[in-house]
Amino acid sequence: GMWVAVHAHGAEGMKRAVIAGVDSVEHGTFMTEEVMDLMIKNGTYYVPTISAGEFVAEKSKIDNYFPEIVRPKAANVGPQISSTFAKAYKRGVKIAFGTDAGVQPHGTNLKEFIYMVNSGMPNIEAIKSATIETAKLLKIDSELGSISVGKLADLVAVNGDPLDDIANIQNISFVMKDGKRINHND
């Protein structure tokens, strides 16, 4: 069938979407324990987009970046998404990596790993959220998401061990696409 994601901040909208059978909830800012339990029961993924919330919260400190009426809401969204994420992860909601493309500048999406870890997710689980869990969510885990015989050889190699320090994931050594190393200058 069709894959469906819902952009939702409020609990009632999330609840209705999860009951209707969506595959994932994006943002989930004001997710309640009731919604978390429904997501667990239905196998619904949570894509928290913490980096988008943090970016908006940071920009709320700049005069005239947002209309004055929006600034208080923008200031609270980052900490709220982080808090919701921590609760959802601890409760057992399935997590997939996502950053809400277009909110923050291109190339800064790797910060999502740092925010996830700072909110209580172990480094290896943050990495899995961006690999095998996202592949499962998108129903392409037979092709991508893990290193296995028969799967596409799409890899990112980093300098340093991201299991020791998740920030090392930003130190990209090379990228491999379909088994071919992609040179930075190509």
Report each predicted region and the residues it spans:
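Short aromatic-centered micro-motifs
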Residues: 175
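His/Asp/Glu-enriched, well-ordered alpha-helical/loop segment
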Residues: 3, 68-69, 76-162
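Active-site core of metal-dependent hydrolases
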Residues: 1-78, 101-103, 120-122, 136-138, ...
